[in-house]
């Protein structure tokens, strides 16, 4: 069984590294990716932007997702927080929050959301990514 992971912030430094490392795993695959509305690559297939196999288009609106997702990784900016958390709540998707700079109110809301969703707050994935690359 494989896990389909959606990455919000997939075109950023960390998002690219994670997406490309997923190509080396059999148990997790990239389902799709999200970027800000100003990203010049919106609408393009991810495999034309990154060195990956995923053919889904880069999106900026979570409502445009029409494929299966098992979990979400957020490595985007805090500007995306509200839309992402609402999407995960609506779809009942577990997510890993690896972005930083959240307000106390946002962190408090995460605590509330964690009563109904599995949430991992991991604001520094540098060590984790290095370990993933070595495995």
Predicted regions and their residues:
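Structural detector of well-ordered beta-strand residues that form the stable sheet scaffold
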Residues: 31, 59, 96-97, 118-120
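Rossmann-fold NAD(P)-binding glycine/threonine-rich loop
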Residues: 79, 84-90, 98-135
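NAD(P)-binding Rossmann-fold cofactor-contacting core
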Residues: 24-50
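Structural motif
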Residues: 70-71, 94
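Extreme N-terminal starter segment of soluble prokaryotic enzymes
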Residues: 1-6
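Glycine-rich, highly charged phosphate/nucleotide-binding loops
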Residues: 48-67, 73-81
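N-terminal Rossmann NAD(P)H-binding glycine-rich loop of SDR-like oxidoreductase domains
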Residues: 7-11, 15-20
